[in-house]
Amino acid sequence: MTAPTTGATAGTTAPAPVPVPAVEAESTADRLAWHLCGGCRTLLYGKRFLAANRVCPECGWHAPLTAPSRLAQLLDPGWSELATPVPADPDPLRFTDSAPYPDRVRQARERTGLAEAVVCARGRIDGAEVIVAAMDFRFLGGSLGSAVGEAITRAGELALAERTPLVIVTASGGARMQEGLLSLMQMAKTSQMLGRLDEAGVLTVALISDPTFGGVAASFATLCDVIVAEPGARLGFAGPRVIEQTIRQKLPPGFQTAEFLLNHGIVDMIVPRGDLRAALSRLLRVATGVHEVAEGATAEGATAGGGLSDGHDGAERVITEVLHLPVRHPWDAVRQARALGRPTTLDLISLLLDDFNELHGDRASADCPAMVAGLGRLGGVGLAVIGTQKGHTVAELSERNFGMPSPAGYRKAARVMRLAAKLGLPVVTFIDTAGAHPGVEAEERGQSVAIAENLRLMGALPVPVVAVVTGEGGSGGALALAVADRVLMCANAVYSVISPEGCASILWKDATAAPKAAEALRVDARQLLELGIVDGVVPEPDGGAAADPVHAAALVGAALRATLATLGLAGPEELVYRRWLRFRRFGAVAGEPAGASPPGRPGNSEHPGHSEHREQSS
């Protein structure tokens, strides 16, 4: 382990002893010892166990890490430890159980070599600057007391002052009972600190290790932008024993584990310990990259960033003239749009983006498999990508709910849009859905509300928003991802208020009249461009996107780069105002200007982003 350099914050007193010697001595002893795996109960030789970062090579069980070991694992060599604050009154309640509270703290310090249950540091992950606060369960169960809350808050305030991402590694049984309600106040204090980082647009990441419960789980552990969990890590407000003893409820297998929480929409990703550095590095590269218009970009988007090349010049990237599109029967487009070979959202992501970080869950109840969302880089530009996901086989379609999102899917999309607004990243959406998922459960969980909230949210995003209908654009379920500055459509895609079959059944009383309904609804790209519903059409390879998915993806990528370059020239207020004008004109009264700015121009309202956006808007 590389010993950290020491550093103190002005006005604080660095505690003794320094933690590094105790950790090194422990590691030397561990190397010669045998360890019993907490998962499969296999005996592991110390040298092999430590080489695997305390992960069982047989079953993958992740043993606890000390805070200094965690920092050494995550950070580049040369990181510096921040001073641990000392509360004015370390024993405010004069608390005694079987031993006085000060004696317990003293014993914990002697046993661990730490000043408190958290170690904070300044360092880098693959060169990207970060502030890290790592908790240590060995110190009074990692409990949240005044010193821990103050240390984490100060780490956050340093991240705020330096506009540096904050990473918090959690390991805690909850609030420190010996400090009473003063411990509980640390939940509020740290939560307010994270709120300030949200306002400032500073990325926050929580790394959940086992266990994380109580006041820590109900504050900073679950308020960060991205929640990463180690395999098997447990997270919850009330522990299993409390639940079983209080309400006598039988708990399901795997309850409160990372895997359980991923399925229930609480954590973004599960990352094995050996992959954590790479995962955090990838996330930092995207989230902290500066969004700039490509050098030489013009209002027409004649040049754009790198990425896949389509071999076409700028004029062919997006077709904006109706005369340049062939006349066709809309039913032909419907059949092409539904072809299973067309590139899906995940196909487009894999072909177009670098450093993609898929984010899961609505942070409330579920993770919808029909909606994919995350952060990545297109030609070096960081952005948020959100899209409905179908599949190429019946099995894949079934697994992805046939691309029909649940309320949790739309709420996941909204969460990632808000994150993009906070970080100042453009939003790109890919739409290929027959519509929002219907059914009892969807209605019980507020499908209408989830869609409506997305419409309102997208209208106020202070960043460029581009929507691409890549296949089917079905009704409000598609519109919930299409309130954008530019709405593009692939040449063989369709976009409609209802499926042709549904329209035919209702109005013609005959499902076989679907081709006639498609024609009446004008669902194809040419007619929707003529109506002004879409702003441009993305060409497809000969034979359609299914015939050459790689080329089709390249064409989409070229269209996106050109469009984002154009939108990047406008500020947040102008983007919001033009987006409002774009949708305000639909259904305007004849003879009245559809674009007249009413009192309280939309661009002047508060955006769901950070303070820098609001400053630019003033």
From Swiss-Prot:
Chain ranges of the CoA carboxyltransferase C-terminal domain: 317-566
UniProt keyword annotations, A-Z: ATP-binding, Cytoplasm, Fatty acid biosynthesis, Fatty acid metabolism, Lipid biosynthesis, Lipid metabolism, Metal-binding, Nucleotide-binding, Transferase, Zinc, Zinc-finger
Cofactor: Zn(2+)
Biased composition (Basic and acidic residues): 607-618
Pfam families referenced in this protein's UniProt entry, alphabetically: ACCA, Carboxyl_trans
Entry's Gene Ontology molecular function annotations: acetyl-CoA carboxylase activity; ATP binding; carboxyl- or carbamoyltransferase activity; zinc ion binding
ZnF (C4-type) residues: 37-59
Entry keyword Magnesium: no
Stretches the record annotates as Disordered: 591-618
EC number: 2.1.3.15
Region annotation Carboxyltransferase: where it falls in the sequence: 33-566
GO CC terms, sorted: acetyl-CoA carboxylase complex
Similarity remark: In the N-terminal section; belongs to the AccD/PCCB family.
Assembly description: Acetyl-CoA carboxylase is a heterotetramer composed of biotin carboxyl carrier protein (AccB), biotin carboxylase (AccC) and two subunits of ACCase subunit beta/alpha.
Function: Component of the acetyl coenzyme A carboxylase (ACC) complex. Biotin carboxylase (BC) catalyzes the carboxylation of biotin on its carrier protein (BCCP) and then the CO(2) group is transferred by the transcarboxylase to acetyl-CoA to form malonyl-CoA.
Listed name of the protein: Acetyl-coenzyme A carboxylase carboxyl transferase subunits beta/alpha
Organism (species): Frankia casuarinae (strain DSM 45818 / CECT 9043 / HFP020203 / CcI3)
